[in-house]
Amino acid sequence: MNGNELASELTRAFPGAPGDLHRLHARLAAAAQRDGILDVAYRTVDSPVGPLLLAATEAGLVRVAYASEDHDAVLQALADRISPRVLDSPTRLDAAARELGVYFTGRRHSFDLPLDWRLSAGFRRAVLSHLTEIGYGHTASYAAVARLAGNPKAVRAAATACATNPLPVIVPCHRVIYSDGRIGRYLGGPDAKRALLALEAAA
């Protein structure tokens, strides 16, 4: 049972005031973490590019997902790939939510969050690990990123790595475009990518 299913069950079992349900859920989440039965915590946050799902393990932030990816499908994928012990636990992601909030005001240019890279491997991981070298307000080409990752000929693979980045916004794949200026693929869609580039260009 994931966090959404648990919340539905709690609502049916305890049809009291929303505040009571929220406090009960918070206690259950804290107990699950204390007892080692919470492997993936998640929450959603509003943003100028739509609601974002944030998910974290003990190692750090493991997933950021746009609404267009279907948050329920993302949670199921996390349950399949990491652990079925997934729970809506907002406090575990307070720091990430705060940093994203400041980023979207234009006052934060980088993130200081521990990251869990387990959803990336090989050349894809190498590509993503270099993206923070692209400065805020700047862009780089897929060809340049392929060179940074150690394989100048792997431009298409670099583009695929950026397009499937499990940590968009935090790991700034939106700063990578084609050499001819085309925007390229993006998990959140082209409008979200343009919005992030415009935000950074204006700061």
Predicted regions and their residues:
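Basic nucleic-acid-binding alpha-helical/helix-turn surface characteristic of O6-alkylguanine DNA
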Residues: 1-152, 201-203
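Short beta-strand-to-turn element immediately C-terminal to the catalytic PLP-Schiff-base lysine
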Residues: 55, 185, 198
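Short glycine/serine-rich loop segments
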Residues: 153-195
